[in-house]
Regions:
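Terminal leader/tail segments of proteins
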Residues: 1-97
Length: 97
């Protein structure tokens, strides 16, 4: 895992705010949001038992996949151009994990 991903994920999980290269974490009202190049890719509702949702925001890039894979309970891989989330084909739409 890249250092920028590790730092962003730690901030995201701890409910912090920060910018890490092309990744920004903003926390307001108990909800952390992770942005990559200005696109929302993950949310974490700290007050609701840690409900986390992810999306690729329409970008099937290596960087998007790498940032999302840094999150707990997220394993994304690409096979023949198709993305799989935790072993299931995934279209990149907002999904609770």
């Amino acid at each position: 895992m890249r250092v920028v991903t590790q730092n962003a994920v730690t901030c995201f999980q701890n409910g912090g705010n920060g910018t890490f290269s092309n990744t920004r974490v903003v926390t307001e009202n108990g909800i952390s949001k992770m942005y990559l190049f200005g696109n929302l890719i993950a949310t974490l509702e700290h007050k609701v038992g840690g409900v986390m949702k992810i999306t690729n925001a329409g970008w099937e890039s290596n960087t998007t996949r790498e940032r999302l894979n840094g999150l707990p309970n997220v394993h994304i891989r690409q096979v023949r151009g198709e993305w799989f989330l935790n072993g299931q084909k995934w279209n990149g739409q907002l999904t609770e994990v």
